[in-house]
């Protein structure tokens, strides 16, 4: 369950950033996660609910996830195509020589905070 490590790292970054910004609380965090990261959404949500309570800044913070589906480019014919996690062969020329263009993201896109000011 690598979601625990992912959430732990995300919360550390969020809390550090929120403190530097003078936040009184974190309202919402938006993540972008590619399907190729093999993150289980239910496990991510569970870890978030548990670990966000460790700091008063994130006690009520909502987590939103934007999924990124994999897309690859064929290095033989140049075709760009969407696929699932397991089938990366080019649909145009059937080559297995492809490059993953997106789908491995694991990014904090934004966070909404409140300040006492």
Task: Go through the PLM ranges and name each one.
Residues 82, 95-99:
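Short functional micro-motifs and their immediate structural scaffolds
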Residues 68-69, 84-85, 103:
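Flanking scaffold residues of small Cys/His-coordinated metal-binding clusters
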Residues 74-77, 90-93:
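Short cysteine-rich clusters marking metal-coordination/redox-active sites
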Residues 20-70, 79:
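A broadly conserved sequence feature marking short terminus-proximal activation segments
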Residues 72, 88, 106:
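Cys/His-enriched microdomains
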Residues 2-15, 38-41, 53, 57-64, ...:
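Extended interfacial segments that mediate partner engagement and assembly in macromolecular machines
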